[in-house]
Amino acid sequence: MDIRGTDTPLLDWSGEAIALGIFENETALTGELTQLDEKIGGTIAELIEEAEFEGKSGSSVATRIGGKSPIRKLILVGLGKKEELTLETVRLGAATVARLGKKEKVKTLAIQFPVVDNDAAQTTAAIAEGMILSLHQDNRFKSEPEDKPLKLETVDILGVGEQSEAINQAETVCSGVILARELVAAPANTVTPVTFAETAQNLAKDYGLDLEILEKDECEKRKMGAFLGVAKASDLPPKFIHLTYKPSGTPKRKLAIVGKSLTFDSGGLNLKVSGSGIETMKMDMGGGAATLGAAKAIAQLKPDVEVHFVCAATENMISGKAMHPGDILTASNGKTIEVNNTDAEGRLTLADALVFAEQLEVDAIVDLATLTGACIVALGDNISGLWSTDETLAEEIKTASEAAGEKFWIMPMEEKYFEGLKSPIADMKNTGPRAGGSITAALFLKQFIKETPWAHLDIAGPVWADKENGVNNAGATGFPVRTLVHWVLK
């Protein structure tokens, strides 16, 4: 699909289908829409009247254009109230257009939406993202793909100018999102710690990233007892992955992104039982997948920021070598942990990863993890929890998420709740009381950061969509690659 920006007037464009964004309660035709309506035989006014189209957010309607018009299809998309227009409105509207264009089997399409905040570049990028991500289908594991090959070949975004840089950036970011989606969607017999590390190797080779992979013996030398405690039950070797993007000049900032990378989580000896969603636990490396997705995008966009990508990849399995409930592990910072639940393993792998990241002497660390069901209970499937020791960092991420159209909610770091993690025989337990479980998980991770500004993103809900939702089709979403990229770029 070739996406292009253009100043070609609406009345001069020729192709198969035109998509128009309409504000709520502003369906009366004026200006060039009146002229276009006359050109195509009154189809716009007729469609608005017959469909009782009001322009409400999320609404859409399409029809065939009769007569001798070279334009065969018309698509109207509701953008909601004019004063509430955002980049996300445009992004979601573009996703609707893309799906309707595919359904209507058009090859060439023009889309005309209003420019948000007089920023044609950002508006163009949002439209491109909405179209690319909504049309992505992962058919790798089907013998006969359900969908026929995509018909949509060319999309012209009208009224924005050429905008090749904005479109290229959107395509690059989407390539990172799609990598994350495909890693999360792939089963655990395809994406293992070994193949996950191979993905990192391919990124390093293709995009000029520095790569260090610590094998088990090196992790032992570094005393990563928390990470290795989780890893020891698996027949597959753990892989501690460290990718680095370095700009050509002096970096204005150094950042670290740390992703939880459990390629499968059985729960360990605290085995996940029937009804617990064990079959979905291939997605427990969603944080690591997004970390590699962000690495792919950032390496191509080349910001003047040094970024370290850290993934402690392993499985949480059962065997005679498995860690027991009640075991005490020692992390690489010397902190001891009583394992009172082997199914709270992600935080154990992150503990050593955070210690490693801080030793890189970066200016800020962000970790992301499908960490707790408690966060889903609190915020649902569409919103990620955000905890931080630094107010400025939290606001940076929140701002980046709003630009990306990915939702975060800043959560409390209630220090008193750490009382629930105290152990009589170790420095802490790995889980606390049921109440406030996502907060105690964040407090646990905080014990492995000394002074560096740090934020924790619990992405357990948004990493997967059970049904079509916005720019996401059912399946892995690639959340929050776009937020991470926006954060680094800004």
Swiss-Prot record:
The active site is at K272, R347. It comes from the Bacteria. The keyword Cytoplasm applies. Its main location: cytoplasm. The keyword Ubl conjugation does not apply. Belongs to the peptidase M17 family. This is Probable cytosol aminopeptidase. It comes from Crocosphaera subtropica (strain ATCC 51142 / BH68) (Cyanothece sp. (strain ATCC 51142)). The lineage of its organism: Bacteria, Bacillati, Cyanobacteriota, Cyanophyceae, Oscillatoriophycideae.
